[in-house]
Amino acid sequence: MTDGDSPLGRQAQKSKNTREKILNSAISLIKEGGYSAASASRIAERAGITWGAAQHHFGSKEDILEAVMTISHERFIARVSAPYLREGTLADRVDAFVDCMWEHYQEDVYLAGLEILLASREVSSRRMSTFDQSAREHIKTLHEIFHDSDLTDEHLQEVLIFLHSVMTGLTIEKVLEKELRGEQRHLRRCKLMLLTAISNV
């Protein structure tokens, strides 16, 4: 009998599936109606469970929302860890990195995380710790992708914050207007900005 066939293995898989249903429920509700639409009762209802069962898996609505943001970060790190981003010329890597970021910013989980951040401006100590850890991972990743740049951690963080701010603004514009006019031109500008900054021109 394998672990997946054992009672413990089946229970673990069932628990994992339920957690995913809860998180997907929260993400879809936020996508459809914004942060306020993701009430505790509606998250549980859409997931097909009671709120008590949801609490068993996460503890509170706030824990669910924190988990959504964690997933968004994990998916971003998984994307930018792809080997192809570390291949080719500097210009090739800049183009690929910006495209990779943009693809992530179009995902429902990123948009849900953005809504959560905007709606809950008070930064908890736990979230601040998560932000710090995320920043360190992002800088490490940038050093790996742009290994031929001599920018310091501080300068790389400045570049990433600027790029993130521009692309988040473009993402919000796309959400509000249903489309982003001149999308490819905007992305080319982002690539030129990043290439200039990474080249330390």
Language model regions located:
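Basic, helix-initiating cap at the start of DNA-binding domains
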Residues: 1-33, 40-46, 63-66
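Short amphipathic helical patch at the helix-1/turn junction of helix-turn-helix
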Residues: 34-35, 55
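Amphipathic C-terminal alpha-helical segment
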Residues: 103-104, 119, 144, 163-181, ...
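Short helix-capping/turn signature of helix-turn-helix
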Residues: 58, 103, 115-123
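Hydrophobic alpha-helical connector segments
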Residues: 67, 80-110, 153, 159-163, ...
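Short, basic, alpha-helical segments at the C-terminal edge of helix-turn-helix-like DNA-binding modules
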Residues: 70-76
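Amphipathic alpha-helical packing segments from all-alpha helical-bundle domains
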Residues: 77-82, 106-108, 124-150, 157-161, ...
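Short hydrophobic/aromatic patch on the recognition helix
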Residues: 47-58
